Each structure stands twice: as C-alpha cells, then as structure tokens.
Amino acid sequence: MARVLICEPHDDISALLELVVRRLGHEPVAFVGGDLEHVSVDAAVIEPGEQSSLEVARSLRSRNVPVLFTSIYPPGADALELKPAAYLVKPFPLYALERALQAALAVDVHAPAAVG
C-alpha cells in the first residue's frame, strides 16, 4: 500500500481524490500545510494553482517522489519544469487519474538507475 499526498484546495474535489486513492488500495494523506520534511509519501496529487502548491511539489520532486498535477488550466512553465508524472486538466475522467497514479507508483523512484 502506497501513501499518496493529496494537496487540493477544494474540499469536494479533495474528498473525491481520496476516494479514488482508497479504491486503488492506497492510503490518502491530506496536506493541510506545514513542513514536509517529516512527511513520508510515495506519490502526490497536487492542484498547482498557488505558489505554495508548487513549493510542495518542488520539495517532493527533490526527493524523487512522483507528482501528478490536476488543474482547470493547461500546464504552465513552472509546473512543467518539475517534470510531473502526469498533468490532468479538470474535468477529467476518474480512470485517467487511476491510470496515471498506478503508472507513477509502478516506477520505483528509489531504485538505482540502470547502468550500461
């Protein structure tokens, strides 16, 4: 079971994202602000609308945690430079989130890179 951080400012959408994560057999972790240094997660679903959300994503990406962005807007340069595992434009079908999350979690980001 993976731990998936949910960083979404809208309560109704956050609840839906948590439901999808649970349905896939993973543990949703709600992000309510604060320090991420001691937060251990395997992936994150983030709405990158505010600078603080991008900082959360930047912190997680620095630890090689895969990040999926969800937004009503097309991806901006700030979001794309973080190399998200996926960028889903709202509204999107839930199966798109399921597939993107499963793909992100299937990659062992902590394994050493293959050489040769």
Task: Identify the function of each model-found stretch.
Residues S14, H38-R63, I72-Y73:
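Conserved phosphotransfer microenvironments
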Residues Q102-G116:
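The C-terminal output helix
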Residues E55, I72-L88:
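Alpha4 helix (beta4-alpha4-beta5 surface) of REC/receiver domains from two-component response regulators
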Residues F92-Q102:
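C-terminal output helix
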Residues H10-A30:
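Two-component/phosphorelay signaling modules centered on CheY-like receiver
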Residues P9, T70-P74, P91:
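Conserved active-site segment of CheY-like receiver
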